[in-house]
């Protein structure tokens, strides 16, 4: 079942964060990850959300793959590149095998 990683980041050190992003663009696909959307928030339709954030939505084959990737020694090294570069919130949700009816 697909899983999705959502990331919001308020970047304080663009140069350092760019190094992290560059590494992740190579690392994530090795684990079946593909970026679905990335950019600045265009508009908050309801509620409160920091619009100074950058947002990323990535799809992976499963929650287990995300967790294994996250806990890998390779990611541990990559993650050091973004330490101190910004405030980051990351969460995952499990997708659906079939289209949901609304």
How would you name each of these model-derived features?
Residues 1-71, 95-102:
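Short S/T/G/P-rich N-terminal loop/turn motif that feeds into the first structured element of a domain
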């Amino acid at each position: 079942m697909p899983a999705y990683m959502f990331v919001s980041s308020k970047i304080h050190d663009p140069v350092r964060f760019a190094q992290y992003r560059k590494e992740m663009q190579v690392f994530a696909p090795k684990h079946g990850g593909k970026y679905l959307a990335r950019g600045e928030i265009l508009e908050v339709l309801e509620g409160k959300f920091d619009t100074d954030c950058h947002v990323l939505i990535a799809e992976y084959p499963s929650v287990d793959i995300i967790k294994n990737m996250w806990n890998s020694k390779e990611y541990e090294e990559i993650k050091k590149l973004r330490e101190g570069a910004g405030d980051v919130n990351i969460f995952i949700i499990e997708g659906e095998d079939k289209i949901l009816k609304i």
